[in-house]
Regions:
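Fungal secretory targeting signals
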Residues: 1-27
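N-terminal pro-sequences and low-complexity stem/linker regions of secreted or lumenal proteins
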Residues: 23-470
Length: 470
């Protein structure tokens, strides 16, 4: 299939963008890529050959709306870039008064919070830059850099009747080791990405589409096009079918909204039978009948759902992760399966690491009106918030913390992001990059080792419920 239409100059300009402004927003700062745990160079013939030899099935699940610091901020494991290891960080109650009161990250979060943080594009702008409509040119040249100081203030703008301390508990709080035991198992046993960012600084559907297509097709909100299969760009589903790669979208949405494969006009016209109930996944995993690509939609987004999207419980989401892992681990496909657990976006929760700039996927822009009435146009030239992401298989290194990757188009040090999945799947299944964003995304093929581990747990630790916000 053809790649999505793009600006021809984007690939050529990517080097200068990353050279002039650092990965995390401060001019001149450079970071090193993480040394390969197995000696493979990402994207090299040897690494790709090993990936193809070891991995025959991929299971990919996007959970919902949690930042790295929110989920892993209280996990005391060496190497994790989080508040419990590095010290708590603070936000002003009012970004316009830097000398005023501040509130800090803390070991105080809720299994579910009542007030969903703003995760629109202009909401993210305020949380990252302290203003709804920052100057795009100044962001690109480094005159304005993200400080991630606006989370408490934005929560108070969204919910003016709550106290500042409750606002901070909701958006700055993080979970303790005891509250996320299932996820700690994954950290201890497999590979955790320290710096993995969402595709765009915006809400759910554009981020899910961008993860699946390498572009949100110019969409920056959860508009009605996603519900009527009106996204016309190529996706991993269309691409897989064109390469005779078997796939299923296991649908756990319970009819609340369409599963992600049905964002696309092509799927609605050609592959509706590839969408099956989520229950089928567990029987297919245990029976050894999984397709080459399994894409899982969790339930979302209120009480008694398992995506972790507020006000769904984090404990329910951990149960979902455990169910997926346990089924794959106990099934015959474990020996050749790569399980990727990530999130769609950071959901308006605080994270102390600013988001990097990024190569635009195409020439499209998106304009929205902010809470204060300002108009802002986004050019899809920077990533969204940092999110937890785990690589799980019989071949991933035990307890590995992966920091930075390498931009395959430029050789520059680069943070991982949602489109790193498409880049890696392209290496595995021999399909072309769908957009320039994918072409500039680090792959993670080098994290698959040459020998199957014999010490992976048969099951993950179950979570326990803990108090909700009210």
């Amino acid at each position: 299939m053809k790649a999505n239409s793009t600006l021809l100059g984007l690939l050529a300009t990517s080097t200068s963008i990353l050279d002039n402004v650092s990965l995390f927003g401060s001019p001149g700062k450079r970071q090193e890529a993480t040394p390969s745990p197995f000696g493979y160079k990402a994207g090299s013939p040897a690494s790709v050959a090993n990936l193809k030899d070891k991995i025959k099935h991929v299971v990919w699940v996007l959970l919902e709306n949690r930042s790295f610091d929110n989920i892993l901020g209280g996990v005391q494991r060496p190497g994790l870039d989080n508040p419990i290891n590095n010290g708590d960080v603070c936000n002003p109650v009012n970004v316009a008064n830097s000398a005023g009161a501040t509130l800090c990250t803390r070991l105080k979060d809720f299994d579910s919070i009542a007030n969903d943080p703003d995760h629109s594009i202009t909401g993210n702008n305020f949380e990252f830059y302290g203003q709804f409509a920052p100057d795009n040119v100044a962001i690109q040249n480094g005159t304005i850099t993200a400080t991630n100081q606006g989370f408490v203030n934005k929560q108070l703008i969204s919910y003016p009747t709550i106290t500042p301390d409750l606002a901070a508990a909701q958006v700055m709080g993080y979970y303790s080791d005891k509250e996320v035991p299932t996820l700690i198992d994954v950290v201890d046993e497999f590979a955790t990405f320290n710096y993995w960012f969402s595709c765009i600084p915006g809400p759910t559907n554009p981020n899910r589409a961008c993860a699946l297509s390498g572009t949100s097709d110019g969409h920056g909100s959860n508009d009605g096009n996603f519900s009527i299969a009106n996204i016309s760009v190529n996706s991993i589903f269309e691409t897989a079918s064109s390469k005779n790669i078997s796939w299923l979208n296991y649908d756990g949405t319970n009819g609340a909204f369409p599963p992600d494969a049905l964002f696309y006009t092509w799927t609605a016209a050609n592959a509706k039978n590839n969408i099956v109930p989520i229950e089928n996944f567990f029987q297919d995993a245990l029976l050894g009948t999984l397709p080459q690509l399994s894409y899982l939609n969790p339930s979302c987004c209120g009480l008694n759902t398992n995506s972790m999207h507020p006000d769904g419980n984090v404990s329910f989401g951990q149960v979902f992760v455990k169910q997926i892992y346990d089924a794959v681990r106990q099934g015959p496909h474990w020996k050749d399966t790569l399980l990727l657990v990530t999130y769609d976006e950071s959901g308006g929760f605080h994270d102390h690491v600013p988001s990097p700039l990024a190569v635009p996927p195409d020439s499209k822009t998106y304009t929205e009106r902010a809470h204060d009435g300002e108009s802002y146009t986004f050019h899809f030239d920077r990533l969204g918030g940092r999110m937890p992401t785990w690589l799980i298989s019989a071949y991933t290194p035990k307890g590995h913390i992966e920091d930075m990757g390498t931009n395959p188009a430029t050789g520059a040090v680069e943070a991982y992001s949602a489109t790193s999945v498409l880049k890696t799947l392209g290496l595995l299944w021999d399909f072309a990059d769908l957009t320039p964003r994918v072409s500039n995304s680090p792959s993670f093929d080098h994290l698959i080792g040459p020998q199957m581990r014999q010490d992976t747990p048969l099951v993950l630790t179950p979570p326990s419920p803990f108090p909700n916000d009210t």
